[in-house]
């Protein structure tokens, strides 16, 4: 990975967008294409569906997608919290089960909090 430059990423992604972006695609279809090509979360490890890019290269992917004015990849807590945690600490079975549906936008995750004594303590109901 260390030999890849932001210029390389830009050139590859721009070429890929030229061949794959279609404004008539549904968001689901587009996100599937992004996931299949490993552009939906390029900082994720390769074995978890990403490209294993560092911050600079992953940031370049976001920049190129924005400049191309295409629909961006899925976002949210699943992508920011769940997928990275599962990629590092999950079993191979958990990685295979949960990460693809997070990266292709099929499933959205949320984070819930319980505040004992404040009315949201579900265990205390």
Task: Briefly describe each language-model feature range.
Residues 74-93, 119:
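N-terminal glycine-rich flavin-associated loop
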Residues 43, 87, 91, 124-125:
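Alpha-helix boundary/capping detector
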Residues 1-76, 94-104, 108, 117:
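Amphipathic, small/basic residue-rich leader segments at the start of a protein or domain
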Residues 82, 94-98, 125:
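Internal, well-ordered alpha-helical segments in soluble enzyme and binding-protein domains
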Residues 108-125:
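A gly/ser-rich beta-alpha-beta helix-loop segment of oxidoreductase catalytic cores
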């Amino acid at each position: 990975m260390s030999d890849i430059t932001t210029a390389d990423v830009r050139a590859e992604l721009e070429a890929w967008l030229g061949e794959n972006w279609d404004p008539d695609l549904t968001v689901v279809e587009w996100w599937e294409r992004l996931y299949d090509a490993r552009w939906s979360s390029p900082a994720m490890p390769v074995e978890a569906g990403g490209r294993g890019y560092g911050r600079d290269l992953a940031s370049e992917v976001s920049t190129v997608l924005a400049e191309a004015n295409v629909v961006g990849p899925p976002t949210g807590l699943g992508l920011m919290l769940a997928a990275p945690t599962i990629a590092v600490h999950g079993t191979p079975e958990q990685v295979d089960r949960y990460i693809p549906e997070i990266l292709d936008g099929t499933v959205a995750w949320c984070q819930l909090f319980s505040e004992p004594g404040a009315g949201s303590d579900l265990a205390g109901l």
